């Protein structure tokens, strides 16, 4: 099953900030993460961490030491909603 990826306003701003940083390794890793999320959002080559203190299941994957990709899976719509991609939670 292929999941559709959607982005929150904050995630779009975060991705733009990462692009402006010019860090090619971060952008390459981010692109790889998006491909993995489409195929298997619950597992992957990077460690998937379930975040606490959220009412809805919210997951995170490491982009690099500084940044995390935070997302939710909407099974009823076969969608992954990316919440943020800049900073550490």
What are these regions (language model features)?
Residues 1-4, 10-28, 32, 59-89:
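Enriched for short, Lys/Arg-rich terminal
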């Amino acid at each position: 099953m292929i999941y559709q990826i959607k982005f929150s306003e904050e995630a779009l701003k975060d991705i733009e900030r990462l692009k402006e940083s010019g860090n090619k390794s971060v952008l390459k890793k981010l692109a790889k993460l998006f491909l993995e999320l489409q195929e298997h959002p619950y597992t992957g080559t990077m460690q998937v961490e379930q975040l606490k203190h959220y009412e809805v299941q919210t997951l995170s994957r490491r982009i690099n030491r500084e940044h995390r990709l935070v997302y939710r899976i909407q099974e009823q719509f076969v969608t992954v909603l990316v919440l943020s991609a800049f900073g550490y939670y």
